[in-house]
Amino acid sequence: MVPLCLLLYLATLVFPPVYSAHLLSPEPTDWVSSEVEVFLEDYVAGVGDTVVLSCTPQDFLLPIVWQKDGDAVSSSNRTRVGQKALRIINVSYEDSGVYSCRHAHKSMLLSNYTVKVIDSLSSGDDEDYDEDEDEAGNGNAEAPYWTRSDRMEKKLLAVPAANTVKFRCPAAGNPTPSIHWLKNGKEFKGEQRMGGIKLRHQQWSLVMESAVPSDRGNYTCVVQNKYGSIKHTYQLDVLERSPHRPILQAGLPANQTVVVGSDVEFHCKVYSDAQPHIQWLKHIEVNGSQYGPNGAPYVNVLKTAGINTTDKELEILYLTNVSFEDAGQYTCLAGNSIGYNHHSAWLTVLPAVEMEREDDYADILIYVTSCVLFILTMVIIILCRMWINTQKTLPAPPVQKLSKFPLKRQVSLESNSSMNSNTPLVRIARLSSSDGPMLPNVSELELPSDPKWEFTRTKLTLGKPLGEGCFGQVVMAEAIGIDKEKPNKPLTVAVKMLKDDGTDKDLSDLVSEMEMMKMIGKHKNIINLLGACTQDGPLYVLVEYASKGNLREYLRARRPPGMDYSFDTCKIPNETLTFKDLVSCAYQVARGMEYLASKKCIHRDPAARNVLVTEDNVMKIADFGLARDVHNIDYYKKTTNGRLPVKWMAPEALFDRVYTHQSDVWSYGVLLWEIFTLGGSPYPGIPVEELFKLLKEGHRMDKPANCTHELYMIMRECWHAVPSQRPTFRQLVEDHDRVLSMTSTDEYLDLSVPFEQYSPTCPDSNSTCSSGDDSVFAHDPLPEEPCLPKHHHSNGVIRT
């Protein structure tokens, strides 16, 4: 028992085109001359594009000198060096590097750019684009014009502080116009804002993260080409949050009177802008007194914020099978960093009144009639089954002729794809034979041979099992000659095959996955098909072997030592992961998902458990070719490894069963969270039913301890409620590449941050783990204990 304290320490919620050279948020470099602060700006262009780098001289009488990687740049057939700009046409990979301009005979830098040339950019890859924007322009010269003026009608935008702001001015013209932004009538650059800006020229957009009051003003987009110019102005107002102590709804909790043995619920509705801390207290007596020497009442803490409790759960106090000792005064105490508030209610417990027993002949008649009807129903069912068995004819003789049936693909493709999901891709011949099938539930079937992928069965040596999948099993094997460059050298592969109890449906799924992998092709960051054994035996599908298992277990095995894990804490991991290693994992997975999206393939379940790691630490996405029946998924049933698939699914996939590339982006955001928690469990301790409500209310997971603010904002963009507002995988690759290039190779993880809240010891629901903080939503950590002074008494009651 403790006296009721009036102070609670709580944390508040912190909660060929031509490209312009101002694309990404600038950051100051360490080696720039101290005379003028120059920002290094990242510039990404596609092969064959035209690059224009601007330079504003301080003295127009002095000549300008351009340098690339420290060497002077001179004019050529592709390069034009001017007094105000450097223009490079038909750029190639060799044009990548660091460009700077300065006055001749002076060391002062005027501008500085990092240029990276990648594969040719295509606006068609941006899923945020509208079709009418892509089709704008018919070859005739025309001045700029707005393509979606209906989306630009809202000129005043008011957002709370810390939110992300995005302005768009979609336009078109011929030639393709350029766009630049003004703030309050002046040129708006990234260095003018502490958090930087993102300029996505392909989307005609300006993005500002973590808005602050200084961002208020008028933002004007100016779109122009040589035939004209248009502009549009938005007004931004950033609203500061008004701090206040928690507000409790009047009348709650309410007094209650119940009989002994009943169940009781007390409700307490709390309203607070800052994250509240809620406790339920019961007033007690000590030595016949309800108050201590200092005038504070004696109380027992019945319920407080814990590891796996949410605000919604804390707002209700449950008392089951109440006794006379439970009668008394109960208090709901809520506080935040501003102050506290509390409401109290009384519970009255009455003795049970024994009711006189009356014979209810109607009830007895109902029970007897029900029993008779049940017995009659069972008798009828037994008689019908006996009659059906007597009517069965003898088995038909074996079929003597060859019958064929088409195997239809069951994979996830976009409706506009050229690959029709109902087109027969493989025709299987069913063999008639007096012998039984090789597998008990699978008919003996003959698959047509594909010379491009067929592998000789005698050159394959099967090894130990690696695991079981949805419809088969996977074993390790040695394949001699499968590598065309080394025909006599064995290569370790993974072989997918049916289980002993496989069915015709399982075979159909395995063939569909094999055909899907053939069509998708090869990429470094996906599991690639190597071959197949389809003749003279069971079907074997040969794929690449990843020796280090799936990404989830790979990360957990490399967590820093000394933490409270379920496995041996004395075992030191063989490899130590740096922050750059984690960013590299995320970058490689994004590359693989970008490739699958380019092939119009929707994965539906991108998660760390579906990413495999090779001996060289290459990330490879697996199971993208599986045929999934989304209408038959048991959303409440855990998988074999204890994971809940719904925790990776986008809201539109959960509630409307709509699967798109945007829903894959949402799942990728959860995968990012897994990476930076080193294999943590998403939404630990949150029941599935509660998760549905939390997602609808806009709750999102908190920033992992070893994750930068920039990467966390990428996660939040992936979890945008509106699918079209989420980034594309191409944009995610660009963002990760930029973070990767700016990350130090010796930036190790912070070992002082506890990982046990993400440990596999915490079950997915009804967890009793006692970590220091299990806040999985965007809230700051709470203090370890509220300021309720206490010490232990021998009878277990807390006393002041």
Swiss-Prot record:
Compositionally biased region (Polar residues): 764-773
Key words, A-Z: Apoptosis, ATP-binding, Cell membrane, Disulfide bond, Glycoprotein, Immunoglobulin domain, Kinase, Membrane, Nucleotide-binding, Phosphoprotein, Receptor, Repeat, Signal, Transferase, Transmembrane, Transmembrane helix, Tyrosine-protein kinase
Membrane topology: Single-pass type I membrane protein
Known glycosylation sites: N77, N90, N112, N218, N255, N287, N308, N321
Membrane-crossing residue ranges in chain numbering: 364-384
Residues annotated as catalytic: D605
CC per GO annotation: plasma membrane; receptor complex
Domain (Protein kinase): residue spans on this chain: 460-739
N-terminal signal peptide: 1-20
Residue ranges that the UniProt entry lists as topological domain Extracellular: 21-363
Enzyme Commission number(s): 2.7.10.1
Positions bearing Phosphotyrosine: Y635, Y636, Y712, Y748
Domain Ig-like C2-type: 21-122, 144-237, 246-348
Record GO biological process: apoptotic process; fibroblast growth factor receptor signaling pathway; positive regulation of cell population proliferation; positive regulation of MAPK cascade; regulation of hematopoietic stem cell differentiation
Positions on the Cytoplasmic side per record topology: 385-800
Compartment list: Cell membrane
Record field: compositional bias (Acidic residues): 124-136
InterPro entries in alphabetical order: FGF_rcpt_fam, Ig-like_dom, Ig-like_dom_sf, Ig-like_fold, Ig_I-set, Ig_sub, Ig_sub2, Immunoglobulin_dom
Similarity annotation: Belongs to the protein kinase superfamily. Tyr protein kinase family. Fibroblast growth factor receptor subfamily.
Domain characteristics, as noted in the entry: The second and third Ig-like domains directly interact with fibroblast growth factors (FGF) and heparan sulfate proteoglycans.
Function: Tyrosine-protein kinase that acts as a cell-surface receptor for fibroblast growth factors and plays an essential role in the regulation of cell proliferation, differentiation and apoptosis. Plays an essential role in the regulation of chondrocyte differentiation, proliferation and apoptosis, and is required for normal skeleton development. Regulates both osteogenesis and postnatal bone mineralization by osteoblasts. Promotes apoptosis in chondrocytes, but can also promote cancer cell proliferation. Phosphorylates PLCG1, CBL and FRS2.
Annotated protein name in UniProt: Fibroblast growth factor receptor 3
Species: Danio rerio (Zebrafish)
